[in-house]
Design a protein with these regions (language model features):
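N-terminal localization/anchoring segments of enzymes in phospholipid and broader phosphate metabolism
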Residues: 2-265
Length: 265
């Protein structure tokens, strides 16, 4: 009878376990003893209370009167990537008072660069900008999106942040091991609201793959452009997350100098 040796598989199992322990050790080293900051200053802020004096509000009222609409709120589906992108860009360029952006992921790529440049331009002309971003994907190159927080008139908060080194994917992964219950509570909301009058909600995050610009593959998503009082309800959900204790101002997590060092490395 043919006998099969069990020594080789056993040796491989030992090597696999040893490699895993090494990886865990490296991960813990990269994570270090860092924790979330305490006694963080989170000034409470709310959506624009009275949007009636803005150009967008006037436009909505004119469109409503022309259409003889019976319902105070209106909706338009944005099924195409180009319509989804140009609509967001138009909201930024038309905003006079406030912009509120809430996303699960914002990628630092060509599509987002142009959009965020417009957001910065809006802040420079006096628009109050609030950006709320889930922290799971804000590592490596995408961490540079957090530089928005250091632009005047822009406030940026990270929801439910991880504690691992932001320039290490492995460190970030291992930071979740000891606090998995909290770490799996991610913020998948996606809102883009201008002057508390017009808002976009749907499946798209911000990045090339959501706007048909990724050569490797693109997501097929659907958005809704909403107008009228329903937008104020969207803003209420934004405010609830924005003022939540799990929303940390970027400045409490990382400095501008650290972001620049990451970019240079």
């Amino acid at each position: 009878p043919v006998q099969h040796s069990t020594q080789r598989p056993a040796r491989f199992r030992s090597l696999a376990i040893f490699s895993l322990l090494i990886a865990m050790g490296i991960g813990m080293a990269l994570t270090g003893c860092a924790g979330l900051p305490e006694n963080v200053d989170r000034p409470v802020s709310r959506a624009l209370a009275d949007p009636s004096g803005t150009a967008l509000a006037s436009m909505v009222q004119e469109q409503k009167a022309a259409a003889k609409a019976r319902h105070p709120s209106g909706f338009v589906l944005l099924s195409g990537a180009q319509a989804a992108y140009s609509s967001r860009l138009a909201l930024v360029e038309s905003a006079q008072k406030t912009l509120d952006l809430q996303y699960y992921a914002i990628h630092a790529d060509v599509s987002t660069q142009r959009l965020l440049q417009s957001v910065v331009a809006a802040a420079e002309r006096g628009v109050r900008v609030r950006v709320l971003l889930d922290d799971l994907h804000s590592t490596g190159r995408d961490a540079q999106v957090m530089r928005l927080a250091f632009v005047p008139n822009v406030e940026m908060r990270m929801f439910n942040p991880l504690t691992g080194a932001r320039n290490s994917h492995l460190g970030r992964i291992f930071s979740m091991v000891g606090d998995f219950s909290r770490m799996q509570q991610r913020m998948h909301n996606k809102l883009f609201i201008a002057d508390n009058t017009l808002g976009i909600a749907g499946g798209r995050n911000l990045g090339n793959a959501y706007f048909g610009n990724d050569d490797a593959g693109n997501f097929v998503d659907l958005d809704v452009l909403a107008a009228g009082p329903v937008v104020q309800e969207l803003s209420q959900t934004f405010d609830a997350y924005w003022n939540n204790p799990r929303a940390y101002p970027v400045q409490s997590l990382i400095s501008r100098h650290q972001l620049l060092e990451m970019q240079a490395s």
